[in-house]
A protein has these predicted regions:
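Flavin-dependent oxidoreductase catalytic cores
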Residues: 1-366
């Protein structure tokens, strides 16, 4: 019997060969000036076995960076580097979306233009948050985030414009679409959270106001590159990057999901952080989101094949994203379908470095 997980799926403008998604994962392997390397083209092409690849997060501007060696999408050289990636993926019969990203307050002055402060919804610093930047001795490593400054209305407009240009650049580089990163304690997630976002203007207060920034960006990006080419990632109840518990979480994400449904986005990608020891998405919230969002839903977080089969067969998910298993298993769909054992990921090689732990994982030999 063929499980739905391995069946083709029509994702708006794309026909996917299966319902398996390669989740976006930061690997910190860009070259000088945050330009994608030829090793990255090899890495993604190896994993074109997925129905859809979602790239690692691409900062939309120099201000959007929070980690060393994360490939950007705001210079001609970066666009040229990503063209090599998309060409390799398409040559391998794959489909690929670019995740476009602003880290918000999760950054350090050593990564910011002219040593300026990171930017977020307010000037409150996340207690205990860190990022991969330069320490006081100029050495790369995990450092505490710098004190942010609050985005004013001009800054919000500037960031919105950066996302639009990044989406255009991604399409110029050959991407099949973009995913707007609204999860994991980064900029848009910070605006969504009622404890973090204490603004008193049109971008703070009610769920409608706290969702406004993300929805404006979705609208602007959709206008720029077209309906059906824009996905959104969220992480309800997430705690990454020192995000606090939000008493208005459910109301916020149900409102957001309903508004995204009205916009006919390509998909809604929901990340559950429980697999990393964080609180899980509350039981019952995903079905509530499913009731108000009728488009394709990607679920991500600690999946194996049986659970993926179950959630797709029950209609909870349309597609399932795999993260760490895809790092170590470029042939993941075949391994899942045939019950073959999985390679173990080299966690010491997750961030930075060269080909080791990146493009040297073998495919299974029956």
């Amino acid at each position: 019997m063929t499980h739905k997980l391995f069946e083709p799926f029509d994702l708006k403008t794309l026909s996917l060969k299966n319902r398996i998604v390669m989740a976006p994962m930061t690997r910190c392997r860009a070259g000088a000036d945050y330009v994608p390397t030829i090793f990255m083209a090899e890495y993604y092409a190896q994993r074109a076995t997925a129905g859809l690849i979602i790239t690692e997060g691409m900062p939309v501007s120099p201000k959007a960076r929070g980690y060393l060696w994360t490939p950007g999408i705001y210079t001609p050289q970066q666009i040229a580097g990503w063209k090599k990636v998309t060409r390799a993926v398409h040559d391998a019969s794959g489909a690929i979306f670019a995740q476009i990203w602003h880290v918000g307050r999760v950054s350090h002055q050593s990564l910011q233009p002219d040593g300026s402060a990171p930017e977020g919804p307010t000037d409150e610093q996340p207690e205990g948050a860190s990022c991969f930047a330069y320490d006081e001795n100029g050495a790369p490593g995990n450092v505490s985030t710098s004190h942010p400054r609050a985005l004013d209305l001009d800054g919000i407009s500037r960031v919105r414009g950066a996302f639009v240009q990044a989406a255009r650049n991604a399409c110029k580089a050959g991407m099949d679409g973009v995913e707007i990163h609204g999860a994991n304690g980064y900029l848009f997630d910070e605006f969504l959270n009622s404890v973090v976002n204490t603004r008193s203007d049109a971008y703070g207060g009610s769920p409608e106001n706290r969702c406004r920034f993300l929805l404006e960006v979705v609208d602007a990006v959709t206008d720029a590159i077209g309906i059906g080419r824009v996905g959104v990632r969220i992480s309800p109840n997430g705690r990454f990057n020192a995000m606090p518990e939000d008493p208005e979480m459910e109301a916020t994400f149900l409102y957001l999901s309903e508004e995204l449904n009205r916009r006919n986005i390509a998909y809604l990608h929901i990340n559950d952080q429980a697999t990393f020891g964080m609180p899980a998405i509350p039981e019952g919230l995903i079905p509530k989101i499913r009731a108000v969002f009728q488009g394709p839903i990607i679920l991500c977080g600690g999946y194996d094949a049986p659970r993926a089969h179950g959630d797709i067969n029950e209609g909870i998910a349309d597609l399932v994203a795999f993260g760490v298993p895809y790092i170590a298993n470029p042939d993941l769909p075949a391994r899942l379908e045939n019950g073959w054992p999985l390679n173990n990921a080299d966690r010491d090689a997750f961030y930075g470095g060269g080909k080791k732990g990146y493009t040297d994982y073998p495919v299974y030999q029956p």
